[in-house]
Amino acid sequence: MLIEEQNGNFAKPVLGAVPFLNEIVNMDWNKAIKQVPDKSIDLVVTDPPYGMKYQSNHRKVQHKSIQNDDNLDWLEGWVVELKRVCKDEAHLYIFCSWHNIDLFKQIVGAYFNVKNILIWEKNNTGMGDLEGDYAPKYEMILFCSNGSKKLNGGRDANILKAKRTGNENHPTEKPVNLISYLIEKSSNENDIVLDTFAGSFSTAQACKQKKRNFICFEIEEGYCRTAKNLLNGVSVSLF
């Protein structure tokens, strides 16, 4: 298990015994989240496994598959834990695929208010059936609330445009600027943001930029070691 505290321009830590604050935590979510106190999380931004045996075709990605991405048996237990740790007015952003959006809406909606489906429009298309299907150019983000909290800065359109990354650090890497936007809309400085499937740690990088505290879990040690360098401003390859 790799748990490393990062030095840098982080948010001011909140008072109280909240474990894993502003640390890289190499641990499965279902073990780590048990240590997170009730009603301690201001915002959830996470990209869970889609349950579709994702396989990257990107030639520079060394870890091409995603651990535990072969089923969604864990989904409701995960949502129950999110309900426990989230504050009463917390927002949640959960990345989804069209393959599983109905299931996610059903299970997440049993515990939270599903407010909208945001569309992340990418600058170029993904892989797939090059002759018999339309080229994928978007991902879905389930926007949920644990209460009636308002968005910062008013109401924006639900189509979000952001360039996709090169996916060199993780096969489903998310742009830091996209995560930063979501964080700014739904949290304030020094709030605590939770990401239970950290991957490339885009959420942690965005939190560092926007002066939020983060709690991030990632089961793959290689991604955690890469994140240690990314959060210090030095990018390295996976090993």
Model-derived features: positions:
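Core catalytic lobe of class I
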Residues: 1-6, 10-225
